[in-house]
């Protein structure tokens, strides 16, 4: 796969691959996810999730083998992207109802700085906003203390990506370290500023409309996402180093 042709937006380390899996593969994944034991689900305030691959700790991963159906899809992502130095070993599966989202956040330091998110079910808009600390020189400085120069401002602007079902979003490096990413909890999503406009226009149904010039769609299904990552440090026993 020539990943460069899937790059979107002005931040050079964000890639959006539409139709990464087929309808049949999406159905198979959903069957596996909802066929898992009820105890596998953890319910949070704004979503519920499944954790696969083991427990992530600041000192590394206490591993648990991925099931074959996850090994298969993560191997495809690993081989297609060419961005992970070794096999993906951790997957978080999140389920969102139409009125649920996730606050802007940054993934922890335990992970290799590449994230691959496979989307199933309802489309949604993911927003990226610059971190309060922007990279400058040898370290991080406060955005308030030293605003980004005009020449680099476009790379630090907020942006959004429309995540269609069966698509794969990959972001790394600056997009990983210098931006927060999140999803609005509104069932009505605006896609005026998405960087993959062509894909946004390809999505249509009778519920879509324009309000005061805004391009919007209504989330009417459950969204499921697979967040696939690599934890480089693997600990067979957390208390032995």
Swiss-Prot record:
2-oxoglutarate binds at residues 223, 229. Binds 1 Fe(2+) ion per subunit. GO terms for cellular component: nucleus. It is an enzyme of class 1 (oxidoreductase). Its main location: nucleus. SUPFAM superfamilies: Clavaminate synthase-like (SSF51197). InterPro entries: AlkB-like (IPR027450), AlkB-like_sf (IPR037151), ALKBH6 (IPR032862), Oxoglu/Fe-dep_dioxygenase_dom (IPR005123). Induction: Accumulates under a salt stress. Reduced levels during cold stress. Seems not influenced by heat, drought and abscisic acid (ABA). Fe cation binds at residues 105, 107, 181. Disruption phenotype: Faster germination of seeds under cold, salt and abscisic acid (ABA) treatment conditions, but not upon dehydration stress. Reduced survival rate under drought and heat stresses, but increased resistance to salt. Enhanced cotyledon greening after ABA application associated with reduced transcript levels of ABA signaling-related genes (e.g. ABI3 and ABI4). Its cofactor is Fe(2+). One of its GO terms (biological process) is negative regulation of seed germination. GO terms for molecular function: C5-methylcytidine-containing RNA reader activity; dioxygenase activity; metal ion binding; N6-methyladenosine-containing RNA reader activity; RNA binding. It comes from the Eukaryota. Its EC number is 1.14.11.-. Residues 87-232 form the Fe2OG dioxygenase domain. It is found in: Nucleus. The keyword NAD does not apply. Keywords: Abscisic acid signaling pathway, Dioxygenase, Iron, Metal-binding, Nucleus, Oxidoreductase, RNA-binding, Stress response. The keyword Mitochondrion does not apply. Probable RNA demethylase that binds to both N6-methyladenosine-containing- (m(6)A) and C5-methylcytidine-containing- (m(5)C) RNAs, thus being a probable m(6)A and m(5)C eraser. Involved in responses to abscisic acid (ABA) via the modulation of the expression of ABA signaling-related genes (e.g. ABI3 and ABI4). Acts as a negative regulator during seed germination under abiotic stresses (e.g. salt, cold and ABA). Positive modulator of seedling growth and survival in response to drought and heat, but counteracts tolerance to salt. Belongs to the alkB family. This is Alkylated DNA repair protein ALKBH6 homolog. The gene is ALKBH6.
């Amino acid at each position: 796969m020539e990943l460069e042709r899937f790059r979107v937006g002005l931040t050079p380390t964000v890639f959006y691959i539409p139709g990464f899996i087929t309808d049949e593969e999406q159905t198979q994944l959903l069957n596996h996810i909802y066929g898992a034991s009820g105890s596998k689900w953890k319910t949070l305030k704004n979503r519920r999730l499944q954790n696969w691959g083991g427990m992530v700790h600041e000192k590394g991963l206490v591993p648990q083998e991925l099931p074959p159906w996850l090994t298969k899809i993560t191997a495809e992502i690993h081989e297609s992207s060419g961005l992970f130095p070794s096999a993906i070993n951790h997957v978080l599966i999140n389920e969102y109802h139409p009125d649920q989202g996730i606050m802007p956040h940054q993934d922890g330091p335990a992970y290799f700085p590449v994230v691959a998110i496979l989307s199933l079910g309802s489309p949604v808009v993911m927003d990226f906003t610059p971190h309060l600390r922007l990279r400058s020189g040898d370290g991080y400085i406060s955005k308030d203390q030293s605003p980004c120069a005009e020449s680099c401002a476009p790379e630090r602007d907020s942006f959004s990506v429309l995540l269609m079902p069966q698509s794969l979003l990959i972001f790394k490096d600056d997009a990983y370290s210098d931006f927060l990413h999140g999803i609005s909890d509104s069932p009505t999503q605006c896609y005026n500023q998405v960087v993959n406009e062509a894909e946004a226009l390809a999505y249509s149904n009778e519920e879509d409309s324009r309000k005061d010039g805004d391009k919007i769609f209504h989330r009417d299904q459950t969204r499921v996402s697979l967040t696939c990552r690599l934890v480089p440090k693997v600990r067979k026993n957390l208390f032995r180093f």
